[in-house]
Swiss-Prot record:
Protein name listed in UniProt: Serine/threonine-protein kinase 2
Binding site for ATP: 93-101, 118
Organism from which the protein derives: Fowlpox virus (strain NVSL) (FPV)
Its job: Essential serine-protein kinase involved in the early stage of virion morphogenesis.
Active site: 307
């Protein structure tokens, strides 16, 4: 079996201390990394932000800026029609428990803080690169199109500049909101107050005009965190309370997708070529199920993702038909999009590519059924319209209801691991006949 194409590049020119390594395309990684403005010099302003605003900025000052015509459209929220990106700026997309994600031109860049106190060696936290690349290299058919492979991964880089950018932006917003609301400026910010006022003003032209004026001065970076800034507040404030680690970590570069799977909704499914939102969820379920079936045809130990949900399935354009063969069954997808599995942070292939993070997430051996149990629960939650389709509801309930299994918070405690033949039988049923080409489904 083939192992991932890994091109290691020990880079000490990026850091004064600590070894760094680049996996994958070093040229594209360096392009991204070198476009982060002043990463080694980003620091809190010499003059404290609250003091500058207290001494020099009044409500009348802000009012004059608001009445001015100048506005930088890159500070609107990304979903706003008025948003317009500047070349080679980084725009915050989202932040979760295990990564801060930005968009930069045709790339998605994910920063992951790795806590050295957890005793992980740098190469033990590379599953987001190694596992999808391993699977892609060993799968031989169109099922490879259902996997997102990282372009490159930088390991053990110093990324604490993100925390400084956060604090600068938080201090800026705190000062602006206090003046706008007629409240006294304070040396210490209240993140709860900033969250409340950010929700109030983020769509406002006046707010964007003020950010256009002050963000370049206070933050002085091409990393724009204004979009979904509330996610960053939740991440850094929660992590600060738990003594979070914000020094070194990994930088992972992915191709830019159209969107994540949950962004296709009852309001827009027709734009993607579907007759209903339920048909789309069947399409998503079938493509991911076929990927798992083809993975389990490989002569390797159990693959488990451990976080299978629409958030971690990305949508890409599909410019030609996709053909998948399982036994005597032929599946054909002619839709203009395809679903691709992403975010392999907790994934593992037992004994071949183990993952210490997976060990902390589950306490016993699991397989594909664990993922689809959780996936089915989430589909019901995200798409309640499924309940109107009795056949699809019944099918998904086969993963969520069983007297022999104990379901706790969508997580499955399994006494016996079901065979992949169970899933093969599921995808051969008439409910998926739209995508089955010329084969009998009478063995339902």
């Amino acid at each position: 079996m083939e192992f991932p194409d890994i091109h290691a590049y020990n880079s000490t020119k990026y850091l004064e201390d600590g070894d760094t390594t680049i996996l994958g395309d070093t040229i594209q990684f360096q392009f991204i990394y070198e476009n982060i403005d002043n990463k080694e010099h980003i620091s809190l302003p010499k003059i404290k932000i609250f003091k500058y605003f207290r001494d020099k900025i009044s409500f009348e000052t802000l009012d004059r800026i608001i009445k001015n015509d100048y506005i930088n459209p890159s500070y609107f929220q990304l979903k706003d029609k008025k948003f317009c990106a500047h070349n080679r700026d980084f725009y915050h997309l989202s932040t979760g428990g295990y990564g801060i994600i930005f968009r930069m031109e045709k790339y998605v860049v994910k920063f992951v803080f790795e806590d050295g106190s957890k005793k992980y060696k740098p190469m033990e936290v590379t599953s987001e690169f190694t596992i999808p690349r391993f699977l892609y290299n060993n799968l031989k058919g169109d099922e490879r199109k259902f996997i997102v492979c990282a372009i490159a991964m930088g390991i053990n880089f110093k990324i604490d500049f993100l925390r400084t950018i956060y604090y600068n932006t938080m201090s800026l917003m705190s000062a602006l909101f206090n003046i706008m609301e007629g409240e006294p400026l304070e040396n210490k910010y209240s993140h709860r107050k900033v969250l409340r006022y950010f929700a109030k003003y983020k769509q406002s032209n006046d707010f964007v005009k003020l950010i256009s004026q002050f963000y370049p001065y206070v933050v002085n970076s091409n990393i724009n965190v204004i979009n979904n800034f509330n996610y960053l507040i939740n991440f850094f404030e929660r992590s600060r309370r738990s003594n979070g680690y914000f020094n070194r970590g990994n930088i992972i570069i992915f191709p830019l997708a159209k969107c994540s799977a949950e962004k296709i909704t009852p309001d827009n499914y027709a734009q993607y070529g579907f007759s209903s939102i339920v048909e789309y969820t069947k399409f998503m379920f079938l493509q991911i199920a076929l990927l798992y079936i083809k993975i389990y045809e490989l002569p390797c130990s159990n693959f488990v993702h451990l976080d299978l949900k629409p958030d971690n399935i990305l949508i890409f354009d599909s410019k030609e038909p996709i053909n998948i063969y399982v036994g005597d069954m032929h599946y054909v997808f002619k839709e203009p999009i395809r679903c691709t599995l992403n975010d392999f942070d907790f994934s593992q292939i037992s004994e071949i590519i183990p993952n210490k993070k997976a060990v902390t997430a589950i306490n016993k051996e699991q397989n594909w059924y664990y993922d689809f149990h959780f996936f089915s629960h989430v589909l019901f939650k995200v798409y309640p319209e499924i309940s109107k389709d009795e056949d699809f509801t019944s099918l998904l309930n086969e993963f969520t209801i069983c007297d022999k299994y104990i379901c706790e918070n969508f997580r499955l405690q399994v006494n016996k691991l079901p065979s992949i033949s169970f899933l093969i039988n599921i995808v051969s049923r008439d409910i998926f006949s739209k995508w089955i080409d010329g084969k009998s489904t009478s063995h339902q």
